[in-house]
């Protein structure tokens, strides 16, 4: 059956989101149509506002409303440590445990030859510039996910950073291989930070 064009466009829009296939997109489209008009308007405004009002911190690459972000601007944080993560959502996960008080650097991806992603496609160059510019940084804690791509990215960064006489550590693997930081509970993350190992 052919859907009316507005529904087809809505389904296509939902399918642009990661992890949303045609069945889920169709279900979301029909749910949206059944929503109250005020709720649809609020939903649309939230999308527009998030896209318009948020940007990336020029220092760490995290999502922010102001530049630098609140974490980079906070003088009470330990500026001798930088945790390197894949995505902004990983910063949120680590902040939720309220045990780590250093800084972050968001890569916005990992090295993935299969997907054609090399070092120039993620935020590695800005990390290296940051380390050269800020002599207070004494340790880089690599917190990429425990996936083959995350491991390859961690080893690549470690090779680049070690000559600068900066300690490079990796989260302990309280995290299961193949798991994402985003889904780990606070205690697992705390143990992983505490048990980090030099690489």
Curated annotation (Swiss-Prot):
Renumbered zinc finger spans (C4-type): 57-72
Transmembrane segments: none
Domain of life the protein comes from: Bacteria
Domain Toprim stretches: 80-176
GO biological process: DNA recombination; DNA repair
GO terms, molecular function: DNA binding; zinc ion binding
Pfam families, per the entry: RecR_C, RecR_HhH, RecR_ZnF, Toprim_4
Entries under Gene3D superfamilies matching the protein: 3.30.60.80, 3.40.1360.10, 6.10.250.240, RecR Domain 1
Listed InterPro entries: DNA_Rcmb_RecR, Rcmb_RecR, Rcmb_RecR_Znf, TOPRIM_dom, TOPRIM_RecR
Keywords for the protein's UniProt record, in alphabetical order: DNA damage, DNA recombination, DNA repair, Metal-binding, Zinc, Zinc-finger
Family the UniProt entry places it in: Belongs to the RecR family.
Function in brief: May play a role in DNA repair. It seems to be involved in an RecBC-independent recombinational process of DNA repair. It may act with RecF and RecO.
Protein name: Recombination protein RecR
Species for this entry: Ligilactobacillus salivarius (strain UCC118) (Lactobacillus salivarius)
